[in-house]
A protein has these predicted regions:
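Radical SAM/AdoMet-radical enzyme domain recognition
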Residues: 5-8, 12-30, 39-181
Length: 186
């Protein structure tokens, strides 16, 4: 379910109102789940509100915060996302999730076909993986965030592809690879 502005604002106000309970020197506001950049207008509003409120309250986090994103990278180069990045670059950490080679990535990261939205399995020829749409944004991402890392999601079925995938990512210029293991059947 989509988070509303009202829920986001209430959560921010609650956290900032309880500064005395949160003595950490800095904070990372982490945007995960689904695809956060599909909600770039809401995220931009949230981040602007956070900056203004931390400043207005003279909050000790104002000079020590980051916005962190885990994204599939598909709309990374969009005008709105790039405007947001330019505005907040010095406070951003962005990781693009790419699972390795095209073969490995496209095993699990498939565009939803109309049949899938109706609860039916699509014909094999109608399935399209997202690798090509993600990999085209890797050079821009690495230019903006040199040394950025990626997350690779693996399950037991993916074990034969790990070495090949890590080497492939390295060849794309991604030299930090974090592996998330899926332990349940998906």
């Amino acid at each position: 379910e989509r988070m509303s502005w009202e829920i986001a604002k209430a959560a921010i106000d609650y956290i900032l109102d309880h500064e005395e309970d949160m003595k950490e020197e800095s904070v990372i506001w982490d945007f995960i789940g689904g695809e956060p950049f599909l909600e770039i207008d809401l995220i931009d509003k949230i981040c602007d509100y956070l900056k203004v409120e931390m400043y207005r309250r003279n909050h000790h986090w104002f000079n020590s915060f980051r916005f962190s994103f885990s994204t599939n990278g598909i709309n990374y180069s969009s005008e709105k996302v790039q405007k947001f990045i330019k505005k907040n670059h010095s406070h951003l950490s962005i990781g693009i999730t790419i699972d390795g080679t095209k073969r490995k990535h496209d095993l699990n990261r498939i565009w939803k076909a109309k049949e899938m939205e109706q609860g039916m399995l699509p014909k094999t020829e109608d399935e399209k993986g997202s690798y090509d749409d993600v990999v085209k944004n890797i050079p821009l991402w690495l230019e903006q965030f040199p040394g950025a890392g990626t997350k690779v999601t693996i399950s037991s079925a993916d074990i034969p592809y790990i070495k090949e995938s890590v080497l492939h990512l390295y060849s794309l210029g991604i030299h930090e690879v974090n592996i998330n293991c899926v332990f349940e059947n998906v």
